[in-house]
From Swiss-Prot:
Gene name for this UniProt entry: tatA
Origin species: Roseiflexus sp. (strain RS-1)
NCBIfam families linked: tatAE
GO biological process: protein transport by the Tat complex
InterPro entries named in the record: TatA/B/E, TatA/E
Assigned GO CC terms: TAT protein transport complex
Keywords from the named record: Cell membrane, Membrane, Protein transport, Translocation, Transmembrane, Transmembrane helix, Transport
Classification via Pfam families: TatA_B_E (PF02416)
Name this polypeptide is given: Sec-independent protein translocase protein TatA
GO molecular function, one term: protein transmembrane transporter activity
Residue span of region Disordered: 45-67
Length: 67
């Protein structure tokens, strides 16, 4: 697979800017950044309650099964 150099990446960036426009690209990038930030916050918030949760009930309870 061929490697892309700086010149090729610059040409691709110019073509993308011409096709979509700068305002649409900045809007998409902003939405993507907000989504990543919300995801990281949700992952971080999930870890905090797990360490401070109440002790689990006894696991020695008998499990009823219908056969």
């Amino acid at each position: 697979m061929p490697q892309l150099g700086m010149g090729e990446l610059l040409i691709i960036l110019i073509i993308v800017l011409l096709l979509f426009g700068a305002s649409r690209i900045t809007g998409v990038a902003s939405a993507l950044g907000g989504s990543i930030k919300a995801f990281r916050k949700a992952v971080r918030d999930d870890d905090v309650p797990a360490s401070k949760s109440e002790p689990a009930e006894s696991t020695d309870k008998k499990v009823e099964t219908n056969v």
